Swiss-Prot record:
This is Leucyl/phenylalanyl-tRNA--protein transferase. GO terms for cellular component: cytoplasm. Its EC number is 2.3.2.6. Keywords: Acyltransferase, Cytoplasm, Transferase. It comes from the Bacteria.
Amino acid sequence: MAIYLTELSPETLTFPSPFTALDDPNGLLAFGGDLRLERIWAAYQQGIFPWYGPEDPILWWSPSPRAVFDPTRFQPAKSVKKFQRKHQYRVSVNHATSQVIEQCALTRPADQRWLNDSMRHAYGELAKQGRCHSVEVWQGEQLVGGLYGISVGQLFCGESMFSLATNASKIALWYFCDHFSRHQGQLIDCQVMNPHLQSLGATTLSREQFIQSLLSFKEKQVLSGCFETQWLATPTSPCAFED
């Protein structure tokens, strides 16, 4: 069966409606265009994101169902809380965004690295614009885990995470959910559900539900200071929001 897919024009930033995305492969919406910051930003504003393999053209996606976290309801496993009390990883926001993006690429097998040089450069430039943010987890002075994504009002579009030490990415997500919700963040987009996300408590929204949430949350801002460079946990206060 032939698949008809929209090719994006390099001359405009227009995307087809997310509701025209394919069912198989789930969410594939368009191909082509470029990775101009204006295009990427326009995509996230519509619930669309780029993802493509080493041999692919630029592909644009809007899957359904959509994996999400409600940061106000996120609860880490008791074992993770116990681990953090003992090991006292440090957790920061926007201290090493470029390093986090690089590690998210390097910790995957070469044939699965969708975060190529062009993508890493684009997200790095979005960070300079204050649109891409990271959470870092440190063991001493070593970066051992983290996550990064794009902020769209009260919605955070999580892009990738990595872990080089036990529980590091789980601790990054835990502290970020608490921090984001305290600053009136409402939803964290995780794109496509997988067993790991499900084990962490992710749920799903239909495309219609996700787009409705996006339209509402993107017009509202998180509280001032949410994405300032800061520490969320240090050895003197590693679990300030424990039960």
